[in-house]
């Protein structure tokens, strides 16, 4: 990794100069441990590994060997190790059917293990937008940081962190589409103003089916928002037969009163649930 874990989150902060920290592996014992005794890092932010790239890495390792050992820690099960860093190397070695792999054993807590895995992958810049967003969210949770503080420690803009985290508010089908590279991150961000998941998923299908570009997607979002503002007026309930009979009877009675010489002032108002009839009789 380009920077030591302590430089990011304050564990043993300033005990070492960065130059020394970058070469920690030279000071630690490298052991050969059984490949089958290693389990994946449960905090690994990467969920998709390219088989093609693993094969390419395996060919490189077959030719040149492993230049940088993997990093592991002991698990509760005796003789078993959990990966901290180096899952791609471990997967490549498995395809080569090696029995052992060079490793450094660390005494890391869950928090440290998760943070190292997240930071290592973020530095490689190979995560999908969704994986990156989950990594930021996990680091914020693990270290109780603000977005601004996390951005400073990772050397990124706060807007970068915020934009990635917004993607996690999108419905699962949209997130899956990003992961599967059916749409771009910019397509996904264009869907955010729609807010209603059903609208976002509907437009997602249209983007994929019609191969809409980002500008076309943004235009569709604007149109959908305008259509949503023009809400149709609620339909008035049709009069039932009993209601019509009642109103006709009342009107006939009022007409008879007026025929007798009494001047009436009447007003009828129709509401959603009822009809209001106001009668004023001068004194």
UniProtKB/Swiss-Prot annotation:
User: Pfam families recorded for this chain?
Assistant: HTH_ParB, ParBc
Q: Tell me the superkingdom of the source.
A: Bacteria
Q: What role does this protein play?
A: Effects nucleoid occlusion by binding relatively nonspecifically to DNA and preventing the assembly of the division machinery in the vicinity of the nucleoid, especially under conditions that disturb the cell cycle. It helps to coordinate cell division and chromosome segregation by preventing the formation of the Z ring through the nucleoid, which would cause chromosome breakage.
What are the alphabetically sorted keywords of the record? Cell cycle, Cell division, Cytoplasm, DNA-binding, Septation
Which family, according to the similarity comment?
Answer: Belongs to the ParB family.
Q: What is the protein name for this chain?
A: Nucleoid occlusion protein
Q: Which GO terms describe its biological process?
A: chromosome segregation; division septum assembly; positive regulation of sporulation resulting in formation of a cellular spore
- Region Disordered: which residues? 1-21
Where is the organism placed in the taxonomic lineage, from the top?
A: Bacteria, Bacillati, Bacillota, Bacilli, Bacillales
Which species does this protein come from? Bacillus velezensis (strain DSM 23117 / BGSC 10A6 / LMG 26770 / FZB42)
